[in-house]
């Protein structure tokens, strides 16, 4: 039985010397051979978060043979990837949550509903933003004069505007999105961790 609780916000910038015991533990784990294993090579610098997200979502889509993949913006934790070796450590820095892939079969109407409901969450139009990266194509949000999203146009990888509202597409999501978004609940749960999907995709 919980009888009391208390908490205190601590600014990380105010922390001076890190705890020595924890620092040694982090160093020990970081130096494990499995984290140093080279899974692939980056032919050039990926200098934008969007580029790193493209790698992640391409790997998700490829892992399930999907048409599209979506991944939330806040889940991409590596903002850039420099040219050269890509180790498992870097992959875990991209996606440190042990998320796995959940698959849905959706038509364009369901995809549009998914994007618009998320985009229109914020009441202040000036603070609305696109939250989901996509692989397999691109999408465009059409807004009214009040800044509210009213339509989404989806395009395939060749830039063709997709207009068949009844055709279903195989779409990969992370289990985080599937558990936190009412529209994405359910679906086919796979045993494919996103980190493993990235590692396989790079090889």
Predicted regions, residues:
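Catalytic centers of hydrolytic enzymes
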Residues: 1-203
């Amino acid at each position: 039985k919980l009888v009391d609780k208390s908490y205190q916000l601590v600014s990380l910038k105010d922390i001076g010397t890190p705890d020595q015991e924890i620092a040694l533990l982090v160093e020990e784990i970081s130096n494990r051979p499995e984290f140093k294993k080279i899974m692939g090579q980056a032919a050039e610098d990926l200098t934008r978060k969007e580029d790193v997200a493209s790698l992640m979502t391409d790997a998700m889509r490829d892992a399930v043979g999907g048409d599209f993949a979506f991944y939330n913006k806040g889940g991409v934790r590596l903002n850039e990837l420099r040219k050269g070796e890509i180790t498992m450590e870097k992959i875990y820095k991209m996606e440190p949550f042990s998320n796995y892939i959940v698959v849905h079969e959706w038509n364009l109407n369901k995809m549009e509903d998914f994007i618009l409901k998320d985009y229109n969450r914020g009441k202040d139009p000036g603070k609305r933003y696109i939250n989901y990266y996509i692989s397999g194509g691109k999408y465009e949000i059409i807004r009214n004069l009040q800044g509210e999203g009213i339509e989404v146009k989806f395009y395939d990888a060749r830039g063709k505007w997709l207009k068949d509202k009844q055709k279903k597409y195989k779409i990969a999501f992370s289990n985080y999105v599937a558990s936190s978004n009412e529209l994405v609940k359910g679906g086919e749960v796979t045993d494919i961790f996103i980190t493993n999907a990235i590692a396989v995709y790079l090889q």
